[in-house]
Amino acid sequence: AVIHDDNVQVVVELTGAAPAYGWIKEALSAGKDVVTANKAVIAEHGDELFALAQDKGGDLLFEAAVAGGIPIIRSLRSGLVANRVESLYGILNGTTNYMMTRMTRGEGDYDEILAEAQAKGYAEPDPTMDVSGMDAAQKLAILGRIAFHATGTGSDLFCEGIENIQSSDIEAARELGYTIKLLAIAKHTADGKVEARVHPAMVPSESLLANIHDEFNAIEIVGSAVGNQVFYGAGAGQMPTASAVVSDLVELAQRRNTGATTAIGDMVLDDEAAPFADIEDSIIRYFLRMRVADRPGVLAQITQLLATDEISIASVIQKERDLEGGTVQLIIVTHEARERSMRKAVAAIDALDFTEGATRLIRMEDQTCRTLGEIE
């Protein structure tokens, strides 16, 4: 009834319920303006809904859909509009950042911290969307649309969660001077696509992103004119979300008072929109952790396998021997290599008769953000 009431000019959808897509579509079809915090609807149905809003002369605003109280959507659409966005690195999910912060502090393992996060209300009873990385992927798809003119949904970009991160990974990262965070990354590729991916990554411990703690979010954008811009704040919660929703409502009211036209046009992508690139074409540094038999020639074979796929080793650390099992833990850090080659090499290493279990692979991002010293 509200949607078709002639006295209603703006429909605000904050339910997060499954029918939300239908309600938003119906409201736009009726010529209403819509404000929503529903990232899934915007990420998965944006093409259709933005085109519909433009056709019907309405508007669709969604500041609260990404990073809660951080005004990242409006900053990209207006404040940074004169820039070509070169890259974006972000911590976009408060639940996983809270969990990784606690695990990094040594306050428990994955299962313990997840249970604590659920008890405190930071994680849903079913935490899959958060811990799998899909929540961050949907947010990155939205940011990719605005910042990079990229077309695609959260399901179209590479997504890996934190479910398999172990305390031993965190300790190994610390010894190397790194901290593990769930990162959302987007950047241009040489062939006109957009490299967009969400996964755990090792970032230098002195970097700003490594020092974003608990449920807070942060986004670093490199613009062609402004250089590095860092946005930081509460990524979720009742009041930050309400702040973003009200800001959208105020913007709509200001437009109506001034007679300004809808601003939806920049969200409707044309034939020149860039697709998301395949992660297998990405060139990244890698951390590998494996347990192998303690015998001569093992490291030489592993080195040869990596070399066969044109993967260069930056450093190797061998831990003390497990006296009971007769195995040792090897940690290998590589120089930049193509993801496709790395996956092939890891599969070959895991197939060797002296390798025990699966090799742990974590991507490394050294060029993420300025250090704390540079910020100060």
Place the predicted regions along the sequence by residue.
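Glycine-rich phosphate/pyrophosphate-binding beta-alpha loops
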Residues: 227-229, 233-239
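A short hydrophobic/small-residue beta-strand
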Residues: 33-35, 313
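Low-complexity, glycine/alanine/valine/leucine- and proline-rich hydrophobic stretches
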Residues: 199-224, 238-239, 307-324
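Substrate-binding/catalytic subdomain of NAD(P)-dependent oxidoreductase enzymes
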Residues: 112-211, 216-218, 237
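Rossmann-fold NAD(P)-binding glycine/threonine-rich loop
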Residues: 17-30, 39-78
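Rossmann-like NAD(P)H-binding beta-loop-alpha module
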Residues: 54-135, 142
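A conserved regulatory-domain signal marking ACT and ACT-like small-molecule sensing domains
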Residues: 244, 249-376
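A structured beta-alpha segment of the ubiquitous adenosine-cofactor-binding alpha/beta core
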Residues: 1-20
